[in-house]
Amino acid sequence: MAKKKIYSDIEFPTEIVAESKSAYGLKTYISLFSSAGVGCYGFKQEGYYCIATVELLERRLNVQKCNNKCAYNSGYICGDMTEQSTKDKIFRELDIWKHGFGVDDLDVLIATPPCQGMSVANHKKKDELKRNSLVVESILMVKSITPKFFIFENVRAFLTSVCTDLDGNDKSIREAIEANLSGLYNISYNVLNFKDYGNPSSRTRTLVIGVRKDLKEITPYDVFPDKQPEQTLRQVIGDMPSLQTMGEICPDDIYHNFRKYAPRMEAWISEIKEGQSAFDNTEISRIPHTVKDGVIVYNAQKNGDKYTRQYWDKVAPCIHTRNDIMASQNTVHPVDNRVFSIREVMRMMSVPPTFKWSEQSLEELNALSVKEKEAYLKKEEINIRHTLGEAVPTIIFKQIAHKVRKVLCRSTLSEQEIKNLIEKRNLTDAAKLIEFIKKSTTHTFAELSKIAELANAQHDNNAAYYTRQDLCFTIVSSLPIPKGQTTVNILEPSIGVGNFLPTLIRKYESATEVNIDVVDIDANSIAILKELVQKIYVPVNVHITYINDDFLLHQFDKKYDVVVGNPPYMKLTKEKKLLAQYKAEAYNKNTNNIFAFFIEKAIKIGKFVSLIVPKSLINAPEFNDTRELIGQNAIRRIIDFGEKGFKGVKIETICLQVDTVAKQSDTVVESYITDEVECHPQSYITSSEYPYWLIYRNAEFDKVADRLTFNVFKSYRDRTITKAITKPTGRIRVLKSRNIGDNTIIDIPDYDSYIDDVNNLDVAKYLNQTECVLLPNLTYNPRACFMPKGCIADGSVAILTPNENETITEQDLAFYATELFSHFYAIARNRGSRSLNIDNNSVYFFGKLKHTTL
């Protein structure tokens, strides 16, 4: 055992320390509301270490101890998740693993908060618990710990149930998850029946999986359980011995038992066949009833599956908490006159035989006398059955655990390795690239498509760049699923090598028919794509049509439900004839950048448009008309990737999602810069009050705006002064950005520049114009001063000319240097990192104080 000074009283097992230093390190998780640990036993099976497990009921936590779930006894936390003391215990365990084993980044957080108020099965729960505070506590723990993955599992109605969010407002649980976690995580929301994913019984549940956005190329789809054929009840328990005597316990398995019930009830089920209920009996005496004061009172049949004998050759029924009584749902054995035994229920919930309910081994329990077995079952059976009815099937979490480990441990090719591979195999030759893809058995689709994108000889000419799978998921997860349609028509207008296809197919695979038309101007890209498609699963209901043509000139004969993609960003300067063709149909004729033309055409032929485009769309004067056109539609979502969209490409990007059919309402802004998601009325962030969209606009921005009168300057920047024409001394000083201080000029040795003659320079018109204001051009920390006599400024400084009749004071300029204005200005510039030039749009925000007091 090793010891760490900071926790001198704690021993750190050397085998765990050794594993923590291995190539792949430890895999860890925390489980909240873990009950007996049936579900997360799947993580133990996959070799994960449980840092902490939290359960309110000690008897259930004790079951977890029987299975040696945690390395430290302190990891078993019996407590209420609404209490700070419970949370503090979790954070202490995290700290122990951080200092003892170097675990500073939790892999998985699991939360299965009690579903009180959400179950559709229990008619007695009439008053929905609006707060659902335990769900909110789960969200808060994810926010606090920020694990790589989080998993929420709950009942079917989970996402639509109401909770009081952290902001104090009532909203659906899905909205609360979105508001708090979707800035940091890619999240999939699924209501599914676990019988289709490896569980031996029917169980319709909600499964929410979040993947932290800094995990490149990993999406929730990568860790989702696999679809598998259904199993029949006969396949699951048909080999188990029949139990026909009430109270009988299988000698080889204490958990295969005939649970006793009132003998008079046997007649209610003894004559019914598979699929029949005791209420179907024709003899009145065999219909479930009670006798009160000598009067027969027949039982109510609220749930139609009470006292119902199950089918051998159908999927096993859903296991509920009261699987111990026939009056519950679907609990009667297909042949025997009894409810399912504990072991049968365990099998139906995919709980492996290695799972322990007691400190005693199965062999020890089986060796007990009959009376001792009966005493043990009397004490433990209800707890076991109830926990099984509330549990997540072990196989579901086991699959997720396996896949999480796989994606975290898989080796990926670096960009340099890909470049070396391309050079070594001469993959710039399209034929050789296609052959390489065809023969590849070890590379993922993401790796192959990245290789293909980088290898394509037309890469730079077509302005095409690889779109990571995690970014594709971010975009595709927000796309709508058309209601009431059996056929979904999708268009990818610049498909490249098909980066969006895997996520699009997964998103829409449940539709009856999916038609995906893919367009690319490059024939090589289409040929390569066809080979890449062979590497992904394409269901029979998904049809891909390849169109080798110029999207902007192609004639489409239908309206698409979704247009999604990453169009090229490039200005046409030499191909005048082609540009004229594009502009002939364009609304915005003031730009030569073809992505703007892609937006316009997509809006014409698509009901819902989702395109990755340069962030300059939001604010550049060049795209004023494009914004006007877009604003006539419902802007559903803007995802700000900043510079995180494309590695090695010095461009900021956004994803614009526009609904061309619906009415305008709210716009969601999802930011990779702030890791937050906000929602505002579209009219608020696209207000004509300002010269361009303000996607980060908020109340603090508005407070500062109320203090200023805007639109008081015109902006100018020199484009001709370079180092070649300046010198260390001279007649006229050339001011640069670092020379500009707060109402002062800063002298900087070996930095200051001069020029003798400006007569041939356009900037000469500002010489001695002392009312002009100077501002450093590219900064979020503005400061300003007036133009001194005998000076001009180079292009690193914006020269602001006050409008006629405007008087600017030093107090106005001093306000620009305040922290308050700096925050305001960051929002005014949409938190951009590159598009910070002060142009005649952005100069609008350098206003004049309405009152002179700072």
Question: Where are each of the predicted segments found?
Answer:
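Class I S-adenosyl-L-methionine
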Residues: M1-A23, I90-L106, C115-K306, A375-E380, R385-T387, A391-K406, A620-D702, T722, ...
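Core alpha/beta nucleotide-donor-binding catalytic domains of modification enzymes
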Residues: Y7-I145, R156-T160, T164-D170, I547, ...
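Non-catalytic DNA-recognition/assembly elements of restriction-modification systems
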Residues: S35, K432, H443-T444, V677-T720, ...
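Short beta-strand element of Class I
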Residues: C50-I51, V514-D517
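Short, conserved SAM-binding/catalytic segment
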Residues: K65-S74, L529-N541
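Signature of N6-adenine DNA methyltransferases within the class I
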Residues: R174, E178, S188-N190, D196-G210, ...
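C-terminal target-recognition/interaction regions appended to catalytic cores
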Residues: R259-L413, K727-L854
